[in-house]
Amino acid sequence: VRLEHDCLSRRAVLLAGGAGLGALGLAGCGGGADVPELTGAAAGDVLVALADVPPDGAYEVTLDGRRVLVTRTAEDAVAAYDAECPHQGCTVRATADGLACPCHGSAFDPATGEVLEGPATSPLAPVAVEVRGDDVVLS
């Protein structure tokens, strides 16, 4: 006995599967926190309020098209790094353990940018910043 209307066609299954994969891909593109973007910033320009830089993480900002991580090295001191991993160019992120590349697992010291664990062999490129009053500014 053949049930004509109770079966899905191969085409219906493929279309539904493709739509599901497309929705999953789009979900991965969104939902993240908005990263502030600065263009044409110069020495002395405010990057972020010091209070917005978490003591155990990093503040992310896009500076002239490149992602920058600002980390706290002491209560009133910070460091900043280009977030591009020197290994293969993935974007380094703040984690519970410091700064890490999600692509290949390189880990970096938030205070110095030095490599803690490879495969990266070079430190993160520093971005010159300083604390001025209650703000982190480009220097």
Regions found by a protein language model. Give the residues of each.
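Short cysteine/histidine-rich metal-coordination sites, predominantly Zn2+-binding motifs
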Residues: 99-106, 115-124
